[in-house]
């Protein structure tokens, strides 16, 4: 029986993503001056007001209002329309102590190896996913949804479509055949904020021609595909003026949609000692290398950590019965052999002290080759470890 799968994406002007961009911009500003900054930054944006709160311990003191105004300007909002409130304090000394000196170091495990120096900044479960469905090793609906919102933003910023405003969303439903392969585009939903002057029919034509058609070339609409453009009608009020935004409220957009569970920890605004972020990036890195190695067609990697401990308390691999050489527990053993999974090892392997996080905040954290966790440089080593 055929099945239908849906994924969504939002533009950088969506209020939740605006908050993520601000949070990661604060993080990057700190890291660019002090690579060892500890940052846990949360943002709320509502009509006329942006609140930045959280914990920052750094040798550098960022000018948060300046960062917020810069992000607003780049996204397309008028900074003069927002009051900015900052509620920042330093990281808890109790948490810092557990991160700076891990449980293993305190117990002198393995002679206090440097890889065991850092403890996890919190407990939690992180999930990574990969599949052979697309070149990005992501499910096709996820790829298409992000392409739509990216194309929408490009059309706005380039002036290819006049009258667009920053907020926008996309949703794509793809039909899969009995073999689990995507073969047909069932429904496309595109909501684009616009100026009141642009006629609805003109906007619909422009979005179809300059956003939907180029973004969906890999699986074009057919005569039965339902295309819904601004199905609620008028979309003039948008962004924080219409909806309150928060960091951490687009977890499935940031990751793998409905195709994989989420441990619940958000990414943006957190430095790499927070395994919510770094552990999720490593789990994706592992899953992608397992698929690239030809060891499975799709794969879910789950890691779990205890606060203050360096080594994960769980490493699990699930290939959904697509494994080609050995059982899933064998693959998990190979993962433990090939990959360093302590926070210090993850940070070093994926270069997570570099200020690159603003680029992750919108259009998905995965499937983009500019990020180190998207490399498949461990595929051959993994395969050799199994064989």
Regions found by a protein language model. Name each.
Residues 46, 298, 306-387:
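Internal helix-turn-beta structural module
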């Amino acid at each position: 029986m055929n099945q239908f799968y849906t994924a969504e994406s939002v533009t950088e002007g969506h209020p939740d993503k605006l908050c993520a961009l601000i949070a990661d911009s604060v993080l990057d500003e700190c890291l660019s001056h002090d690579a060892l900054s500890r940052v846990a930054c949360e943002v709320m944006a509502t009509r006329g007001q942006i609140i930045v709160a959280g914990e920052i311990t750094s040798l550098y003191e960022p000018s948060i209002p300046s960062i917020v105004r810069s992000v607003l300007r780049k996204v397309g909002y008028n900074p003069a329309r927002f009051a900015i409130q900052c509620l920042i304090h330093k990281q808890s000394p109790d948490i810092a102590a557990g991160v700076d000196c891990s449980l293993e170091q305190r117990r002198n495990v393995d002679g206090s190896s440097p890889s065991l120096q850092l403890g996890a900044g919190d407990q939690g479960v992180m999930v990574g996913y990969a599949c052979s469905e697309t070149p990005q090793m992501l499910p096709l609906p996820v790829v298409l949804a992000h392409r739509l919102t990216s194309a929408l933003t490009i059309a706005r910023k380039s002036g290819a479509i006049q009258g667009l405003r920053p907020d926008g969303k996309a949703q794509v439903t793809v039909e899969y055949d009995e073999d689990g392969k995507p073969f047909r585009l069932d429904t496309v939903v595109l909501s684009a904020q616009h100026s009141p002057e642009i006629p609805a029919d003109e906007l619909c034509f422009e979005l179809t021609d300059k956003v939907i058609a180029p973004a969906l070339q890999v699986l074009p609409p057919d005569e039965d595909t339902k295309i819904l453009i601004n199905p609620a009608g008028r979309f003039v009020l948008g962004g924080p003026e219409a909806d309150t935004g928060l960091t951490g409220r687009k977890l499935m957009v940031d990751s793998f949609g409905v195709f994989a569970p989420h441990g619940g920890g958000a990414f943006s605004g957190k430095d790499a000692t927070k395994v919510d972020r770094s552990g999720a990036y490593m789990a994706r890195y592992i899953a992608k290398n397992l698929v690239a190695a030809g060891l499975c067609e799709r794969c879910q990697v789950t890691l779990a950590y205890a606060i203050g401990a360096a080594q994960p308390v769980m490493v699990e691999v699930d290939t959904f019965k697509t494994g080609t050489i050995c059982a899933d527990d064998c693959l998990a053993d190979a993962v433990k052999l090939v990959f360093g999974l302590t926070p210090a090892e993850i940070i070093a392997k994926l270069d997570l002290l570099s200020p690159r996080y603003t680029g992750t905040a919108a259009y998905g954290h995965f499937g983009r080759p500019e990020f180190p966790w998207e490399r498949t440089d461990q595929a051959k080593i993994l395969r050799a470890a199994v064989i």
